[in-house]
C-alpha cells in the first residue's frame, strides 16, 4: 500500500483538469516514472458520456456541461456530494486480470458500504452497485474503467449526499427501469471523510482480492 499514492482533493475539481491529470499520470506509471495513485475528489455538476453512450439517453443536454469520457459505459452524472474514486494502477502488478479488477472494485465499495449498515450488491447483468429500497432496486454507485498499456484510470462514483434530481437529465447508464439513491436518502447521514475512511480500511482486502484465484 505504501507504493500507492493516496490523493484527496478538497472542494470541486474541474473535470477537464482531472482527465488531463489522469492521462499524464497513466503515461508516467507506464513509463515507470511515477507511483500508482488513488485519487478521491468531487466534481461540479456535469454529465459524462462513456464509449457506449446513446444520445437519446441525454434527456436535458443543456442542463449541465457534457463531457466525453474515455471509460466504458453510457451517460452518468457527477456532482457535489458524490465521492469519485479514480484508480491509476498497473493491473499487471495486481493479478493481471481486467475483469477481476472491475469486479474487485465493486466488492471493495460494497464491503465499505457494509460498515454503515448498508446491504449493497452487484448484479450479473447490470454493472454498478445496487441496494434495495421501498421503491425497488436503486443504484448507489457506478463503475467505469479504462485501461491503457495495462494501467487503469477512471474508476467509481458513490452517492453520499448528491442532489438526486440532477440524475433526471439522463437515463443513468442506459437503465430506465431503476432509480438512483444515496447514503443520505437511505438514512445514513455519514460524511465524505467517513466514507473515505471506510474505503481506506477495506483497501487491503481489495488488493488481496485482485490476487485471488477464486471465480466470480
From Swiss-Prot:
<keyword id="KW-0963">Cytoplasm</keyword>
<dbReference type="GO" id="GO:0036211">
    <property type="term" value="P:protein modification process"/>
</dbReference>
<dbReference type="InterPro" id="IPR000544">
    <property type="entry name" value="Octanoyltransferase"/>
</dbReference>
<feature type="binding site">
    <location>
        <begin position="155"/>
        <end position="157"/>
    </location>
    <ligand>
        <name>substrate</name>
    </ligand>
</feature>
<dbReference type="InterPro" id="IPR020605">
    <property type="entry name" value="Octanoyltransferase_CS"/>
</dbReference>
<feature type="binding site">
    <location>
        <begin position="71"/>
        <end position="78"/>
    </location>
    <ligand>
        <name>substrate</name>
    </ligand>
</feature>
<dbReference type="GO" id="GO:0005737">
    <property type="term" value="C:cytoplasm"/>
</dbReference>
<comment type="pathway">
    <text>Protein modification; protein lipoylation via endogenous pathway; protein N(6)-(lipoyl)lysine from octanoyl-[acyl-carrier-protein]: step 1/2.</text>
</comment>
<dbReference type="InterPro" id="IPR045864">
    <property type="entry name" value="aa-tRNA-synth_II/BPL/LPL"/>
</dbReference>
<keyword id="KW-0808">Transferase</keyword>
<feature type="site" description="Lowers pKa of active site Cys">
    <location>
        <position position="139"/>
    </location>
</feature>
<dbReference type="GO" id="GO:0033819">
    <property type="term" value="F:lipoyl(octanoyl) transferase activity"/>
</dbReference>
<keyword id="KW-0012">Acyltransferase</keyword>
<dbReference type="InterPro" id="IPR004143">
    <property type="entry name" value="BPL_LPL_catalytic"/>
</dbReference>
<feature type="domain" description="BPL/LPL catalytic">
    <location>
        <begin position="32"/>
        <end position="211"/>
    </location>
</feature>
<comment type="similarity">
    <text>Belongs to the LipB family.</text>
</comment>
<comment type="function">
    <text>Catalyzes the transfer of endogenously produced octanoic acid from octanoyl-acyl-carrier-protein onto the lipoyl domains of lipoate-dependent enzymes. Lipoyl-ACP can also act as a substrate although octanoyl-ACP is likely to be the physiological substrate.</text>
</comment>
<protein>
    <recommendedName>
        <fullName>Octanoyltransferase</fullName>
        <ecNumber>2.3.1.181</ecNumber>
    </recommendedName>
</protein>
<feature type="binding site">
    <location>
        <begin position="142"/>
        <end position="144"/>
    </location>
    <ligand>
        <name>substrate</name>
    </ligand>
</feature>
<dbReference type="Pfam" id="PF21948">
    <property type="entry name" value="LplA-B_cat"/>
</dbReference>
<feature type="active site" description="Acyl-thioester intermediate">
    <location>
        <position position="173"/>
    </location>
</feature>
Amino acid at each position: 500500500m505504501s507504493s500507492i499514492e493516496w490523493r484527496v482533493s478538497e472542494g470541486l475539481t474541474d473535470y477537464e483538469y482531472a482527465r488531463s491529470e489522469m492521462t499524464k499520470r497513466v503515461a508516467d506509471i507506464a513509463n515507470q516514472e511515477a507511483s500508482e495513485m488513488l485519487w478521491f475528489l468531487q466534481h461540479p455538476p456535469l454529465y459524462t458520456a462513456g464509449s457506449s453512450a446513446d444520445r437519446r439517453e441525454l434527456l436535458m443536454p443543456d442542463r449541465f456541461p457534457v463531457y466525453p469520457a474515455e471509460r466504458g459505459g453510457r451517460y452518468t452524472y457527477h456532482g457535489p456530494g458524490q465521492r469519485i474514486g479514480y484508480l491509476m494502477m498497473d493491473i499487471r502488478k495486481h493479478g493481471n486480470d481486467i475483469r477481476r479488477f472491475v469486479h474487485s472494485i465493486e466488492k471493495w465499495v460494497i464491503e465499505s458500504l457494509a460498515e454503515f449498515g448498508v446491504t449493497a450488491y452487484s448484479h450479473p447483468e447490470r454493472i454498478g452497485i445496487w441496494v434495495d429500497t421501498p421503491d425497488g432496486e436503486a443504484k448507489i454507485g457506478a463503475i467505469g474503467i479504462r485501461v491503457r498499456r495495462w494501467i487503469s484510470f477512471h474508476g467509481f462514483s458513490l452517492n453520499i449526499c448528491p442532489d438526486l434530481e440532477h440524475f433526471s437529465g439522463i437515463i443513468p447508464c442506459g437503465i430506465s427501469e431503476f432509480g438512483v439513491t444515496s447514503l443520505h436518502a437511505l438514512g445514513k447521514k455519514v460524511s465524505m471523510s467517513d466514507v473515505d475512511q471506510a474505503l481506506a480500511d477495506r483497501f487491503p482486502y481489495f488488493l488481496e482480492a485482485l490476487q485471488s484465484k477464486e471465480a466470480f
